[in-house]
Amino acid sequence: MKYLERLTPSCWRIKPGFVPNMKVEGRFYVNKALEALMLEELQQFASARGVGGFLPAVKQIANVASLPGIVGASVGLPDVHSGYGFAIGNMAAFDMDDPEAIVSPGGVGFDINCGVRLLRTNLTLEDVEPVKEQLAQSLFDHIPVGVGSKGVIPMNAKDLEEALEMGMDWSLREGYAWAEDKEHCEEYGRMLQADASKVSARAKKRGLPQLGTLGAGNHYAEIQVVEEIYDKEAAAKMGINKKNQICVMIHSGSRGLGHQVATDALVAMEKAMKRDGIEVNDRQLACARIHSEEGQNYLKAMAAAANYAWVNRSTMTFLCRQAFAKQFNTTPEELDMHVIYDVSHNIAKTERHMVNGTERTLLVHRKGSTRAFPPHHPLIPVDYQLIGQPVLIGGTMGTCSYVLTGTDTGFRDTFGSTCHGAGRALSRAKSRRTLDYQQVLDKLDKKGIAIRVASPKLVMEEAPESYKDVTAVVDTCHAAGISKKVVKLRPIAVIKG
């Protein structure tokens, strides 16, 4: 433990030397329970060599700290768990002016722009409870779900090219989004550096039939009810003004298209690393210099995949609005079904941050980590200037979700980043071995949660028991001051792939 040091009750430091070539320190945020999970994983690794195919999260955070061009610290957020290359819940920023600085697809993840969108309504629990089952069924019928699910939005190859370049502007033009939806979306739902020509034919082939589909795994659409309001002023700015108000949360990403973009880039970058003599501690950290051809190609393709994911969430928003309007025999406008915000938690972005007292342009990798900008930041919508950027934290099936806001402390300490959800505690394989799907469904039923699942066998992987406690994760971020609690939401109906 000589390389690990507790800095504050909720933050640990990983000192350089823990792994070779560390350029900056590592830091991770945990409370008592989460700390035990992190250190147990490390001890298991030390005694048994290996946790599945991944290194333990503490080691992964340290390996990222050894990548060329990194500044500040390699940061692990409270929901951190081991992933491909970077841990999921790891944030790292690289100096764009350093010719050696790199971009790594493992620092973004395979599901590019996997993210969360929250819609509010003017309905209350009393309105929805009697028709909960019908509403869940209606959502399930409207939104295509599951592993190979096909979209219902008519699309040809030309439409896909445009959607990849235009993001939510495409949804707006095609009539699937409201003008103000864009305002309440990170990047306004469109990354301008997207270049569809950098997305391979295979990725496009995978993406074409899947637009407007939910996908499987931890993706879901949830009908939620406001259970607690911690910050009345901030909640009011978001249009949340009472307990028992109904909201809808959509969690989805770029489906097979984003996965293929990441896979293609990793192949190209392995070659670039040999050519440029880039050495890394773990071959899963394949990367390329930001300004190399491979680095730029990846960033342009990643932006296109991110746009695809925003179009995807917009399409599902459209289908959600349809389902609600049909059930309540009115219009989505009458139901006040506005987007509160839409955040990404798997993405790399160019941002300005202070490093050692000077402002620098950085490429911030957030993998399983959410942007959380403070009040008055120029990149957040006018409506939220006084309270800070809304941050949406999805729980797991049957547990609570949270809305937080960004803070100045977070902007300084974690480059404006916070957690993204609960974070796995059990691997998918272990969840399947130890949990029984009927029990998982019965438990949800007892909590009064209506559930519709396309692939019941996947339920165990996503059972609350497979995850860390989302409340512990959010409370740790709140205690560390890197984001602030605003609202707690509880699910009453879940639609899953």
Swiss-Prot record:
Superkingdom of origin organism: Eukaryota
Annotated positions binding Mn(2+) 2: 114, 251, 345
Residues binding GMP, per UniProt: 218-222, 345-346, 394-397, 401, 420-423, 496
EC number: 6.5.1.8
Binding site residues for Mn(2+) 1: 111, 114, 219
Reactions catalysed, as given in the entry: a 3'-end 3'-phospho-ribonucleotide-RNA + a 5'-end dephospho-ribonucleoside-RNA + GTP = a ribonucleotidyl-ribonucleotide-RNA + GMP + diphosphate; a 3'-end 2',3'-cyclophospho-ribonucleotide-RNA + a 5'-end dephospho-ribonucleoside-RNA + GTP + H2O = a ribonucleotidyl-ribonucleotide-RNA + GMP + diphosphate + H(+)
TM annotation in the entry: none
Gene Ontology MF term list: GTP binding; metal ion binding; RNA ligase (GTP) activity
Family matches, as InterPro entries: RtcB, RtcB-like_sf, RtcB_euk
GO BP: any one term: tRNA splicing, via endonucleolytic cleavage and ligation
Active site: 420 (gmp-histidine intermediate)
Keyword entries, A-Z: GTP-binding, Ligase, Manganese, Metal-binding, Nucleotide-binding, tRNA processing
This protein's GO CC annotations: nucleus; tRNA-splicing ligase complex
Signal peptide: none
Cofactor(s) the protein requires to work: Mn(2+)
SUPFAM superfamilies linked: Hypothetical protein PH1602
Free-text remark on how the cofactor is bound: Binds 2 manganese ions per subunit.
HAMAP family, per the entry: RtcB_euk
Additional record remark: Ligation probably proceeds through 3 nucleotidyl transfer steps, with 2',3'-cyclic phosphate termini being hydrolyzed to 3'-P termini in a step that precedes 3'-P activation with GMP. In the first nucleotidyl transfer step, RTCB reacts with GTP to form a covalent RTCB-histidine-GMP intermediate with release of PPi; in the second step, the GMP moiety is transferred to the RNA 3'-P; in the third step, the 5'-OH from the opposite RNA strand attacks the activated 3'-P to form a 3',5'-phosphodiester bond and release GMP.
The family this protein is said to belong to: Belongs to the RtcB family.
Assembly: Catalytic component of the tRNA-splicing ligase complex.
Role: Catalytic subunit of the tRNA-splicing ligase complex that acts by directly joining spliced tRNA halves to mature-sized tRNAs by incorporating the precursor-derived splice junction phosphate into the mature tRNA as a canonical 3',5'-phosphodiester. May act as an RNA ligase with broad substrate specificity, and may function toward other RNAs.
Record protein name field: RNA-splicing ligase RtcB homolog
Native species: Monosiga brevicollis (Choanoflagellate)
